[in-house]
Amino acid sequence: MSEAEYLKAVEMLNIWAKAYYTQDNPLATDIEYDVLYKKVETFENEFPDLKVSYSPTNRVGDAVSEGFEKINHKAKMWSMEDIFDDNELLAWLERGEKAGLEFFVEPKFDGASLNLTYENGVLISAGTRGNGETGENVTQNVKVINSIPLQIDYKEKIEIRGEVVIAKSDFDALNDERANSGENLFANPRNAAAGSLRQLDSAVVKSRHLKFFPWDVGENSLNFKKHSEIMEFVRNLGFLKDDFVRVCASLTDLRKAYVDLHEMRERKDILMDGMVIRINELTKCENMGYTIKFPRFMVAYKFPPVEKATKLIDINLQVGRTGVITPVGVLEPVNIDGATVRNATLHNFDEIARLGLMKGDIVSIIRSGDVIPKITGVFGARRNGSETPIKRPEFCPVCGSRLLVEDIFIRCQNLTCKARIVNSLIYFCSKKCMNIDGLGEAIINTLFEKGKIINISDIYTLKADDLEGLEGFKDKKISNLLASIENSRISPLYRFITALGIEHIGEVAARKIAEIFGENWLNASFDEILKIDGFGEAMAKSFVGFCEINREKIENLLSFLHLSAQKTEISQNVFTKKTVVITGTLSISRDEMKEKLIKMGANVTNSVSKKTDFVLFGKDAGSKLEKAKMLGVKAISEDEFKEML
């Protein structure tokens, strides 16, 4: 094969791949493709200096990365404003004189946003959205996604933006495979797509069958007048095109498009959570510009949460670290929004009574985004007499001890109950507590069953000899685990207090105790604790009682640790003593943002109420942002947050 023949073969393979992967229109048999591919591969092995970057052999996916470098986008990747009903749509249309304009609409696929950069017709880089200006360089992984061309027929520099997704059918197959391997399941296709894109091993990425759907361009030198023309041009370069793309000229057209797309929601193999509406005329878009948060010329009309009916087969009882028994509904598997739902939390037995639940009932299940599936109602009229009552338990399902009823809670009081011990160990080692990487649920259960860890202090006496010979424990894993345990010995005091799992004492309360009492925290009296801002009698009683009963165990634990309790000096600012809820994806992790806010004197909570002062939201914010709007709580974007500092 000559160099000219090689280049022609590469071109032919790319044409065939484009027809197969993006047009669903094979131009060659698998055998023809494989034979030509092998010839190209042989030539490249003989003449590696002549190999071109857009060769299909670059999609093999055998590279393992050490991590991801940062990459800057030439043009900012903006978030979109969300709307949830026709009234909000009408209000958006009335802002900025949008009447009489043409609108481009398409599905809002729920995946991971990606920015591709091409120069001289060749893919040179790919970056995740990140904070909109800087993302992670995932070029190596993107090269194994078959629906992303390595070469395009356009020589000018251009950024092409879109969504990396995984089909529902591929998602189900992936989770089945993970279940068979004993791995944790992905919550939904969006998490699977985002997680796959950030795999260090591109062979894993290739096996996930990711797809890329373009939805915009960044930096470019195109001369089109309409967004629809740009997208037609981009898709003709070899990218996927969804079968639902419309140009609408009125509110009636937009409403019809939304209804039509919503009806397709279940049938589509790609998870979508709404419809994107944007002004089609590019000059008008440019004139309208941007707010601090969003483009003024586009909006995401979100779909309502998916609700399904299924059968409640049974009730499982879970025993938490404090002994509280939580009923979990076991469901006939049902697919909701791209995820197979098999369980739903029921919180407590008062909730079961409120709903009037019986085993065998047909129930209504709702799931929105990452929210835990919830039973919202019972179809009582569909009962056939086979249903059975759900009885409150009298004995612990794990240790058999008689249970104590405290208000709405039912509790196991046996401190040696296996479930309580194991869950306490898991909580102690968790990221927000002592952050012992490698000591997760599965490993803790194994170590407990083998008698290697019976209580928390046993963690700090573990030796390599204790771990050798256990299934899955090789030298490297043992070394990493022991190093992680060693690193946890030096920790902020508040993390240790949090890790003890004292009822009513979470991270925020633990921080206050650590800052006020420092090294003398263990000797704080009921009256002293009660004086702390935000503390009530239940919190004070729980903390002091726990410390009195477990003082010897705590002091033993402290002998293994070096804890610091530095008092933070807080300068008065807009967030001091304000209650803040964080939702959505930010440019930094949620824990990092939480730490920032706490250092400014804010109280960071998990749920939105009338007492919430701010909801800080990022990309893909869900029900918390909706609730903030409903309650009139001030919602701020990350950009607004920075402006307020």
UniProtKB/Swiss-Prot annotation:
One of its GO terms (molecular function) is DNA ligase (NAD+) activity. This is DNA ligase. GO terms for biological process: DNA repair; DNA replication. DNA ligase that catalyzes the formation of phosphodiester linkages between 5'-phosphoryl and 3'-hydroxyl groups in double-stranded DNA using NAD as a coenzyme and as the energy source for the reaction. It is essential for DNA replication and repair of damaged DNA. GO terms for cellular component: cytosol. InterPro entries: BRCT_dom (IPR001357), BRCT_dom_sf (IPR036420), DisA/LigA_HHH (IPR041663), DNA_ligase (IPR001679), DNA_ligase_AS (IPR018239), DNA_ligase_CS (IPR033136), DNAligase_adenylation (IPR013839), DNAligase_N (IPR013840). Residues 570-645 form the BRCT domain. The active site is at K108 (n6-amp-lysine intermediate). NAD(+) binds at D30, I31, E32, Y33, D34, S79, M80, E106, R129, E163, K302. It catalyses: NAD(+) + (deoxyribonucleotide)n-3'-hydroxyl + 5'-phospho-(deoxyribonucleotide)m = (deoxyribonucleotide)n+m + AMP + beta-nicotinamide D-nucleotide. Its cofactor is Mg(2+); Mn(2+). It is an enzyme of class 6 (ligase). Zn(2+) binds at C396, C399, C412, C417. HAMAP family: DNA_ligase_A. SMART domains: BRCT, HhH1, LIGANc. Its EC number is 6.5.1.2. PROSITE patterns: BRCT, DNA_LIGASE_N1, DNA_LIGASE_N2. Belongs to the NAD-dependent DNA ligase family. LigA subfamily. The keyword Iron does not apply.
